[in-house]
């Protein structure tokens, strides 16, 4: 169930302050955050936000199509290494 429209989007306060400060300066430095739960708002357009995936920070360049999504959607937490191939040649009857 999506968030109620009357509540508005959730953005962590410390992240909002960092984005607002970058917009005031007019710079586009990488903003490092652990807040995967924050929603992408139009103020973040054009910024690169480094989102933590549990091990390292993944740089995410925010575009117009990402507005309304959560930051965590663009930094996967699990690495899929592929399924193990069956070794049928090794088995002899």
Swiss-Prot record:
Keywords attached to this entry: Ribonucleoprotein, Ribosomal protein, RNA-binding, rRNA-binding
Pfam families: Ribosomal_S19
GO biological process, one term: translation
A single GO cellular-component term on record: cytoplasm
Keyword rRNA-binding attributed: yes
Cross-referenced InterPro entries: Ribosomal_uS19, Ribosomal_uS19_bac-type, Ribosomal_uS19_CS, Ribosomal_uS19_SF
Molecular function as annotated in GO: rRNA binding; structural constituent of ribosome
Keyword RNA-binding: yes
The organism's place on the tree of life at top rank: Bacteria
Similarity-based family: Belongs to the universal ribosomal protein uS19 family.
Stated role: Protein S19 forms a complex with S13 that binds strongly to the 16S ribosomal RNA.
Annotated protein name in UniProt: Small ribosomal subunit protein uS19
Species: Arthrobacter sp. (strain FB24)
